[in-house]
Regions:
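Classic N-terminal secretory signal peptides
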Residues: 11-12
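N-terminal targeting leaders
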Residues: 2-6, 16-183
Length: 183
């Protein structure tokens, strides 16, 4: 029970930091100019709205990220057609240059649930924040079925290598997929 309370606290803190408290800091620390950041945010929100309005795709199963017009769709699907539907909806959005997808089929009886995914993402993020040699505010961490996906723009290949190593060091992580790019 104590673990659940810790987890809920971490989720609330992460949401608070992500929603506004850290926004000004993130804008300043981001490698992209403010206009590009705004365009990317608009693309993300537009895709999320399209996913929410869709009868075929489940919004909460897919996360959307955008960096310099390059979109990343990350999540799970019940039936294979949901992947194509999500990509088709994302392609309709103005400003999208490319779409990269990381989808896993939902597995009945998988022992990695929502709380496990949240816990792993929080632990990986904490490892990244502790390392002052990494621009952690520029890295998004998503866990899907206990597989970590790293996304964002960083300053060097060394930062990418370190970020992947930090993610792999967390107990319970099944695999790490990096979509990190050097800005």
């Amino acid at each position: 029970m104590k673990r659940i309370y810790k987890l809920i606290f971490c989720v609330i803190v992460m949401g608070f930091l992500d929603s506004g408290c850290g926004t000004a800091y993130k804008v300043v620390m981001d490698q992209r100019n403010v206009k590009t950041q705004a365009q990317d945010e608009k693309i993300e929100l537009t895709i999320r709205k399209k996913l929410a309005d869709s009868d075929q795709v489940k919004l909460f199963d897919i996360s959307t990220y955008c960096f310099n017009g390059n979109v990343y769709l990350v999540g799970e699907y019940d039936v294979s057609s949901q992947k194509g539907d999500a990509v088709k909806l994302a392609k309709q959005v103005e400003g999208v240059k490319s779409i990269t997808q990381y989808f896993l089929p939902k597995k009945a009886g998988d022992h990695c649930g929502t709380s496990d995914n949240i816990e792993l993402a929080v632990k990986v993020t904490a490892n990244l924040v502790k390392d002052k040699g990494i621009s952690s505010t520029n890295i998004k961490v998503k866990s899907v079925q206990c597989n970590i996906v790293l996304l964002g723009l960083v300053g060097s290949k060394k930062q990418i290598t370190k970020a992947v190593a930090h993610a792999k060091s967390v107990i319970g992580v099944r695999s790490v997929k990096s979509y990190l790019k050097v800005f």
